[in-house]
Amino acid sequence: MMVSFFDQFASPSYLGIPLIAIAIALPWVLYPTSSSRWINNRLITIQGWFINRFTNQLMLPLNVGGHKWALLLASLMIFLITINMLGLLPYTFTPTTQLSLNMGFAVPLWLATVIIGMRNQPTVALGHLLPEGTPIPLIPVLIIIETISLFIRPLALGVRLTANLTAGHLLIQLIATAVFVLMPMMPTVAILTATVLFLLTLLEVAVAMIQAYVFVLLLSLYLQENV
């Protein structure tokens, strides 16, 4: 029986019940919660420090009206990082390799930023569709181009996250398969390939965190235009 490399991206099911809901809910169980003690343990302290640093960095370019998004964006960042990191473990399923899930995150949040801009400052929001100093003959063309680029934003968010994680998982599986095939025939080459696999895994750990950060950072930039 031939197994496709893309089988790892198929949503698992048990007795016909999709298990993607469990894969999405599992990270929330792993987060440590603060206790009533005066001094927290090291893990909670590091988690609190990371959240504070990230929130301050993310909210720095936003005005006071955008600070109410801090909790949502910080929670989304930690959630995406956890899902991406858990997906690097063997025999696990990564929900963020599904374009439908990523679009489910990207479209509502992008749409919320657009609605906020149209409600609070419609003139400024519509002004983004026409760059200042545009020649009069180019005005209709530029409005169409800017409108298309506006609606492409959520698609770019979802596709970027999906494509980067999918490509990384495929490369890891391809090189791991090569290691097992080369081990009995050419052990030296297999060891070198295993070293490449280890370095690629470290790179994928970085990509898993960076892509989650980029996803949330772009949302904050879209929010900055509309608050």
From Swiss-Prot:
<keyword id="KW-0138">CF(0)</keyword>
<dbReference type="GO" id="GO:0045259">
    <property type="term" value="C:proton-transporting ATP synthase complex"/>
</dbReference>
<dbReference type="InterPro" id="IPR000568">
    <property type="entry name" value="ATP_synth_F0_asu"/>
</dbReference>
<feature type="transmembrane region" description="Helical">
    <location>
        <begin position="98"/>
        <end position="118"/>
    </location>
</feature>
<feature type="transmembrane region" description="Helical">
    <location>
        <begin position="69"/>
        <end position="89"/>
    </location>
</feature>
<keyword id="KW-0812">Transmembrane</keyword>
<dbReference type="GO" id="GO:0015986">
    <property type="term" value="P:proton motive force-driven ATP synthesis"/>
</dbReference>
<dbReference type="GO" id="GO:0015252">
    <property type="term" value="F:proton channel activity"/>
</dbReference>
<feature type="transmembrane region" description="Helical">
    <location>
        <begin position="190"/>
        <end position="210"/>
    </location>
</feature>
<dbReference type="GO" id="GO:1902600">
    <property type="term" value="P:proton transmembrane transport"/>
</dbReference>
<dbReference type="InterPro" id="IPR045083">
    <property type="entry name" value="ATP_synth_F0_asu_bact/mt"/>
</dbReference>
<feature type="transmembrane region" description="Helical">
    <location>
        <begin position="9"/>
        <end position="29"/>
    </location>
</feature>
<dbReference type="GO" id="GO:0046933">
    <property type="term" value="F:proton-transporting ATP synthase activity, rotational mechanism"/>
</dbReference>
<keyword id="KW-0406">Ion transport</keyword>
<dbReference type="Pfam" id="PF00119">
    <property type="entry name" value="ATP-synt_A"/>
</dbReference>
<comment type="subunit">
    <text>Component of the ATP synthase complex composed at least of ATP5F1A/subunit alpha, ATP5F1B/subunit beta, ATP5MC1/subunit c (homooctomer), MT-ATP6/subunit a, MT-ATP8/subunit 8, ATP5ME/subunit e, ATP5MF/subunit f, ATP5MG/subunit g, ATP5MK/subunit k, ATP5MJ/subunit j, ATP5F1C/subunit gamma, ATP5F1D/subunit delta, ATP5F1E/subunit epsilon, ATP5PF/subunit F6, ATP5PB/subunit b, ATP5PD/subunit d, ATP5PO/subunit OSCP.</text>
</comment>
<keyword id="KW-0375">Hydrogen ion transport</keyword>
<comment type="function">
    <text>Subunit a, of the mitochondrial membrane ATP synthase complex (F(1)F(0) ATP synthase or Complex V) that produces ATP from ADP in the presence of a proton gradient across the membrane which is generated by electron transport complexes of the respiratory chain. ATP synthase complex consist of a soluble F(1) head domain - the catalytic core - and a membrane F(1) domain - the membrane proton channel. These two domains are linked by a central stalk rotating inside the F(1) region and a stationary peripheral stalk.</text>
</comment>
<keyword id="KW-0472">Membrane</keyword>
<comment type="similarity">
    <text>Belongs to the ATPase A chain family.</text>
</comment>
<keyword id="KW-0813">Transport</keyword>
<keyword id="KW-0999">Mitochondrion inner membrane</keyword>
<dbReference type="GO" id="GO:0005743">
    <property type="term" value="C:mitochondrial inner membrane"/>
</dbReference>
<feature type="transmembrane region" description="Helical">
    <location>
        <begin position="165"/>
        <end position="185"/>
    </location>
</feature>
<feature type="transmembrane region" description="Helical">
    <location>
        <begin position="132"/>
        <end position="152"/>
    </location>
</feature>
<dbReference type="InterPro" id="IPR035908">
    <property type="entry name" value="F0_ATP_A_sf"/>
</dbReference>
<dbReference type="InterPro" id="IPR023011">
    <property type="entry name" value="ATP_synth_F0_asu_AS"/>
</dbReference>
<keyword id="KW-1133">Transmembrane helix</keyword>
<protein>
    <recommendedName>
        <fullName>ATP synthase F(0) complex subunit a</fullName>
    </recommendedName>
</protein>
<keyword id="KW-0066">ATP synthesis</keyword>
<keyword id="KW-0496">Mitochondrion</keyword>
